[in-house]
């Protein structure tokens, strides 16, 4: 199946040509925006969240055509296959059952395994939080260091930061991912070897960055007085390869299992989220799962016309494949969601940054947009200038939490006002005539610089309060959005072959950096020159 061969495609193309020059300002004009208002028609709810799509460049006819696209592309069949545990990751011959990790039904796949592992996690988390689990000298654990990269880092880090307000104040959680030693070194400056627990997270337990950091941390413990025989008090492992965990030196009792039917970027709901559970406790971790389950149920049962992940995915396709948008911005107006954009970068681009269709043919249409972002209001003072007045179209997801999770409540109206005002300004813009009035007769040359084209599309997601449950729903919303887009593009969102070639060549280059001699013909001239400069700096 090719996207542009679907029966609805010519109708979508014709519709795009029809409305491409229409301005949102006109659609919101009082004469045109009668009851039910545009905001009422294009605001939908699900899983405890609300999404206002009204400031997007679409009409009722657009949504109808996009929903038809979803049906013709088999979105419903792909969704149902994923939930049923079918092989939806054909290149690796695997299911993608992250939803089973939060299911609460006895007939859901792998429930006995999931329940047993979560119970083990809960016992361990309770022991650490209560002080029953101590370091080798009997000190309570005051620091947890999560060592992992990609999905073993981004998800847990994002959630622990987001739920800081409900986390225990007795334990600080640190995350180390980069093989750059500075990442680990800065954490080592802040922790006590007698009161630190390390969680090493790697699906294979062979990941270069993770194992390099894990070995350095183990050496640091020993160098700072921890007997090698007591390291079991300070190290646990999370992996789908328990034998490698034990081989590293972690006690078998300290191994938590993940499975090959859960992809790394979808794995925070599993034992990969052990650092989350220690931070917020097992009960709140269950609430996080419940929120994701709320969105799972909405995704499975809501009509496509009112289905938040479906609509969010289709709106993204509208801009990517018709308007030619190269990127889209995620702007959470919540400092607690500081790491959400970087988490979504991996979720979206590693999942859907593909050029090969499921059938092995190459696509002849764009797939994943570049995903980027920064919390508001910081972004307003960095890159919003380009969003308002630059020539590039960048669709935006605003995320607003309506009630604060902190005691400084007087700040919150200012935060929300900025979020809503930005969406209004991006939609309305400022005409040249309006700019001339502001510039005045004394400075007419200033008017062009005061114009804003407007018509910049935004979606605003509303969360009543940031809780484990609403956060779980928000994360699952984006997970399912990715699946919707993958189904339409006919690609596999659950593999990541694009990371492999660099890893293979990286091992060759690393060997050349320390080898006695290097064959300059082994690499291209640029790479050879880079290696030569590095060897000189390293004293080789």
From Swiss-Prot:
Q: What class of enzyme is it?
A: isomerase
Highest taxon of source:
Bacteria
Q: According to its UniProt record, which residues of this chain constitute the active site?
A: 350, 381, 503
Q: Recall the GO molecular function terms of this protein's record.
A: carbohydrate derivative binding; glucose-6-phosphate isomerase activity; monosaccharide binding
Where does this polypeptide localize? Answer: Cytoplasm
**Mind telling me which Pfam families this protein's record contains?**
PGI (PF00342)
* Pathway the protein acts in: Carbohydrate biosynthesis; gluconeogenesis; Carbohydrate degradation; glycolysis; D-glyceraldehyde 3-phosphate and glycerone phosphate from D-glucose: step 2/4
What Enzyme Commission number(s) appear in the record? 5.3.1.9
List UniProt keywords, sorted A-Z: Cytoplasm, Gluconeogenesis, Glycolysis, Isomerase
- Which InterPro entries does the entry mention? G6P_Isomerase, G6P_Isomerase_C, Phosphoglucose_isomerase_CS, SIS_dom_sf, SIS_PGI_1, SIS_PGI_2
Q: Which GO terms describe its cellular component?
A: cytosol
A single Gene Ontology biological process assigned to it is: glycolytic process
Q: Which reaction does it catalyse?
A: alpha-D-glucose 6-phosphate = beta-D-fructose 6-phosphate
NCBIfam families membership:
PRK00179.1
So what family is this one in? Belongs to the GPI family.
What does the UniProt record say this protein does? Catalyzes the reversible isomerization of glucose-6-phosphate to fructose-6-phosphate.
The name of this protein is Glucose-6-phosphate isomerase
Lineage of source species = Bacteria, Pseudomonadati, Pseudomonadota, Betaproteobacteria, Burkholderiales
Instruction: Give the encoding gene's name.
Output: pgi
């Amino acid at each position: 199946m090719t996207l542009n061969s679907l029966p609805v495609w010519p109708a979508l193309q014709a519709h795009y040509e029809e409305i491409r020059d229409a301005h949102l300002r006109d659609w919101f004009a009082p004469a045109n925006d009668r009851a039910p208002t545009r905001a009422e028609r294009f605001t939908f709810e699900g899983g405890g969240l609300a999404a206002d799509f009204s400031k997007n460049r679409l009409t009722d006819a657009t949504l109808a055509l996009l929903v038809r696209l979803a049906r013709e592309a088999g979105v419903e069949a792909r969704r149902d296959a994923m939930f049923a545990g079918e092989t939806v990751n054909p290149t690796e011959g695997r299911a993608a059952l992250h939803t089973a990790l939060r299911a609460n039904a006895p007939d859901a796949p792998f429930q006995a395994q999931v329940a047993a592992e979560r119970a083990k996690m809960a016992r361990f988390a309770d022991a650490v939080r209560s002080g029953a689990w101590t370091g080798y000298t009997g000190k309570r654990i005051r620091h947890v260091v999560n060592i992992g990269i990609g999905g073993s880092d981004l998800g847990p880090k994002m959630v622990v930061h987001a739920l800081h307000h409900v986390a225990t104040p007795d334990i600080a959680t640190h995350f180390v991912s980069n093989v750059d030693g500075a990442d680990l070194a800065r954490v080592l400056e802040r922790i006590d070897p007698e009161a630190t627990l390390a969680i090493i997270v790697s699906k294979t337990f062979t990941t270069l960055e993770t194992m390099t950091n894990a070995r350095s941390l183990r050496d640091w413990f020993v160098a700072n007085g921890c007997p090698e025989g007591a390291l079991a008090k300070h190290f646990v492992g999370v992996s789908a390869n328990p034998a490698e965990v034990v081989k590293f030196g972690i006690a078998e009792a300290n191994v938590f299992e993940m499975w090959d039917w859960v992809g790394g970027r979808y794995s925070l709901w599993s034992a990969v989220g052990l650092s989350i559970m220690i931070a917020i406790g097992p009960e709140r971790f269950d609430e996080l799962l419940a929120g994701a389950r709320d969105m799972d149920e909405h995704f499975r049962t809501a009509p496509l016309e009112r289905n938040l992940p479906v609509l969010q995915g289709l709106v993204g396709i509208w801009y990517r494949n018709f308007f030619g948008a190269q990127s889209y911005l995620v702007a959470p107006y919540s400092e607690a969601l500081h790491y959400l954009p970087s988490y979504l970068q991996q979720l979206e681009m590693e999942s859907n940054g593909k050029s090969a269709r499921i059938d092995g043919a190459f696509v002849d249409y764009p797939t994943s947009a570049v995903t980027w972002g920064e919390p508001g209001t910081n972004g307003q003072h960095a890159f919003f200038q380009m969003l308002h007045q630059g020539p590039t179209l960048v669709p935006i997801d605003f995320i607003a939490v309506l009630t604060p999770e902190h005691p400084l409540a007087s700040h919150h109206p200012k935060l929300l006002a900025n979020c809503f005002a930005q969406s209004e300004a991006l939609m309305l813009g400022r005409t040249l005539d309006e700019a001339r009035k502001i510039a005045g007769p004394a400075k007419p040359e200033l008017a062009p610089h005061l114009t804003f084209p407007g018509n910049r599309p935004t979606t605003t997601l509303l969360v009543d309060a940031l809780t484990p449950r609403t956060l779980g729903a928000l994360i699952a919303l984006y997970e399912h959005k990715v699946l919707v887009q993958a189904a339409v593009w006919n690609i596999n969102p659950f593999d990541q072959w694009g990371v492999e070639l660099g890893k293979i060549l990286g091992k060759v280059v690393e060997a050349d950096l320390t080898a006695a001699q290097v064959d300059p013909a082994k690499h291209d001239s640029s790479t050879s020159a880079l290696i030569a400069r590095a060897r000189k700096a390293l004293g080789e």
